Amino acid sequence: MILTGDLHASPEELQYLNPRYLRSKFGQKCENTIIVILGDGGFLWHEDPYSDFGGELISTLNNWMKELNSTCIVVPGNHENYERIYSLPKVHLKEKNFEGDFREISPYIKYTERFGEYTF
């Protein structure tokens, strides 16, 4: 498991989740794992073509997680668009290394529920 935080939809901060960077820092440990953004991911802002659905932020992060065969779990922070988060489909996932109810942005990116209970 890799923990990070405060991405704030920043292209510069996003580079810390680039597979090349993660492999140079953690080797094979960054593959088949969970990468957790602890607050303020910055996804899903209305009328922001970079961070909304179909935007570069979600597309890039989804492709990187797919390449790493990993899942990115975002714990919402105080700078999130909760209206959009709670409009996402709710899914219950039980994987080998985590379980809980999530809001799904994509197959590789999930938001935790507020006050949710999770097993990692």
PLM feature spans:
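Core catalytic region of metal-dependent phosphoesterases/phosphodiesterases
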Residues: 4, 10-118
